[in-house]
Curated annotation (Swiss-Prot):
Single GO MF annotation: arylesterase activity
One cellular component (GO) term of this entry: membrane
Glycosylation sites: N159
Gene3D superfamilies the record matches: TolB, C-terminal domain
Record bears the keyword Isomerase: no
Source species: Gallus gallus (Chicken)
Ranges that cross the membrane: 40-60
Top-level taxonomic group: Eukaryota
Membrane topology: Single-pass type II membrane protein
Cytoplasmic side: 1-39
Protein name: Adipocyte plasma membrane-associated protein
Length: 415
């Protein structure tokens, strides 16, 4: 072997260049490509949805002009307010024989209620009968309500006559025996320059002389109650009607959805449930504080509807919407976000939003000073949905509803 051949053999080998990708490299590049495709696809889809949605929210009219409402953090559901299933022990009565029995009274063992089809009904010996109706048909749709009529609050007067607040027609006295109706206050009458658009509840003195009643809004009618809650309109009032002089006086103004009302046992003050603010106001009608007002219960665990006396000297309050804590309260979340409310009602109807709200029900008993004595819950709302009132009679709570096709009855000895 000569020297040249030896040099050729000792020449170092050139490094080999690997041209095929390794499996790890392929996976990495494939993942990066897939991620890029996903991002592009997602952004394209989001843009395709956002553009028409944004256009809709800009171009569509919103039926409400919501104002920010400042609510305190809901009270903790502990102690007396701790959730339970006690309302689920209630039984349903007269199912599909009536609809929307908002308020309930009794004369002896005979029950009376007003319903969503404009009727005032009598329930005697288990039989449902029509006593009277204030409006006229057709009934059954929101568009029909103003002519059909909607009796809400109902009370018994000293001569066993019925006093009824019809949301659209006004304040009436009804003879439960003959069905004769007598108008006391018409919604067509301007009271201090403001119309009555949404009569709601009433409470009557023992001698029948004074009737205190709420007008929930001068802008919104009953069929638009959810607009009233979400907008936070503060045009509600508490009024007084004198059955002798026929005069109507305005006692309180600036209320956000005033709803149920109840005279105290001593008849020295009237409690007014301010639904949109989750609280109870007190207005003094006699004594040294006459004409004054203060807070009776603040920051309640739900939105209160009607209030009635309990046999222990306190008050029953029904709440069809609960503010769970711990938990998520949609109404509290939206309270200071008017822009979200606008978007919701540009895209969805009241009926759709109502169906989306949790059907959780709560009834509380308050002491004579406003402290919580006990609470009855239906966490699912399957037994007692849309509760509007708790009327105590003969050891039972009769539970009204503003839209359910039945009355629920709860035996107080079993809870």
């Amino acid at each position: 072997m000569n020297e040249a051949e030896g040099l050729r053999q000792r020449r170092p080998l050139r490094p080999q260049v690997i041209t095929e990708d390794s499996p790890a490299q392929e996976a990495k590049e494939g993942s990066a490509y897939s991620s890029k495709v996903f991002r592009v696809t997602f952004l394209t889809l989001a843009a395709s949805l956002a553009v028409p949605l944004l256009g809709a929210t800009v171009l569509l009219d919103c039926p409400i002009d919501p104002q920010p409402i400042s609510l305190k953090e809901p009270p903790l559901l502990t102690g007396v307010l701790e959730p339970n299933n006690k309302l689920q022990k209630a039984e349903r009565l007269w199912e599909n024989q009536l609809v929307g029995p908002e308020s309930i009274v009794n004369i002896g063992d005979v029950l009376f209620t007003g319903t969503a089809d404009g009727k005032i009904l009598k329930i005697e010996d288990g039989e449902v009968q029509t006593v009277a109706r204030i409006g006229h048909g057709p009934c059954g749709t929101p568009e029909d309500e103003p002519t059909c009529g909607r009796p809400l609050g109902i009370r018994v007067g000293p001569n066993n006559t019925l006093f009824v607040a019809d949301a659209y027609y006004g304040l009436y006295e009804v003879n439960p025996g003959t069905g004769e109706t007598k108008m006391l206050v018409s919604t067509k009458t301007l009271i201090e320059g403001q119309k009555l658009s949404f009569l709601n509840d009433l409470t009557v003195t023992q001698d029948g002389r004074k009737i205190y009643f709420t007008d929930s809004s001068s802008k919104w009618q009953r069929r638009d109650f959810l607009f009233l809650v979400m907008e936070g309109t503060d045009d509600g009032r508490l009024l007084e009607y004198d059955t002798v002089t026929k005069e109507v006086k305005v006692l309180m103004v600036g209320l956000r959805f005033p709803n149920g009302v109840q005279l105290s046992p001593a008849e020295d003050f009237v409690l007014v449930l301010e639904t949109a603010m989750a609280r109870i106001r007190r207005y003094y009608v006699s004594g040294l504080m006459k004409g004054g007002a203060d807070m009776f219960v603040e920051n309640m665990p739900g939105l209160p509807d009607n209030i009635r006396l309990s046999s222990s000297g306190g008050y029953w309050v029904a709440m069809p919407v609960v503010r769970p804590n711990p938990g998520f309260s949609m109404l509290d979340f939206l309270s200071e976000k008017p822009w979200i409310k606008r978007m919701i009602f540009k895209l969805l109807s009241q009926e759709t939003v109502t169906k989306l709200l949790p059907k959780r029900s709560l009834v509380v008993e308050l002491s004579e000073t406003g402290s919580y004595r006990r609470s009855f819950h239906d966490p699912t709302g399957l037994t007692v949905p849309y509760v509007s009132e708790a009327h105590e009679h003969n050891g039972y709570l009769y539970l009204g509803s503003f839209r359910s096709p039945f009355i629920c009855r709860l035996n107080l000895q079993h809870v």
